[in-house]
């Protein structure tokens, strides 16, 4: 996307979105200036410079998670990290996505957005898309309160940001696809999973698309155990299309947990630990 076009779209952001971006850029600028004094050179060095690398390592996106497992079947019980990387290696620090050759080929043909039908327990299934500048949304999200995803038993806690334990969590974020009250795209997710874990990777995806104008193959699968109404977590995968994953690539499992709260995943009931 060209700079002029990005400027026009950015102008439509809500004040809250602008404030978040301003704060992130301000933080990066302050740290970049400080590192320049220490390391020497100009803050306008290329992305490969020592300053840029140091800035990315400090204020990046919180995506450099040290916990990694070989496969989705090896996910450990939650301890203190909100997500784990799957099949990570030197070229894929945030995990290697498992898209098939056919899925990658489909992504090269054009954008698509598909959601699974709800199952017999009214649970969501996999959400799958090719995202790009044509799918990003800068409009204010509409109300989604009309949707009550499976396991929605809301209680409030003083130690949870915003009070409510649960969010109506988009599998594919509204900012990435423009979907609002789509029951096939909303699950019962904890505040921690929705705003700390998933948002980390959603923001990476949006920034990559905005910065490059390229496309991203993207898949999110809620992970339910048999008969349970609340997902134990979500499996998120992404791979940039035009550069074969060189610009963006992740395969992570985000835990649907909230520190200090015990959740009955069968019913959605919950209480302070």
What residue ranges belong to the model's regions?
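N-terminal Lys/Arg-rich, disordered targeting/topogenic segments
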Residues: 1-23
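Domain-level detector of nuclease and nuclease-like folds
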Residues: 99-273
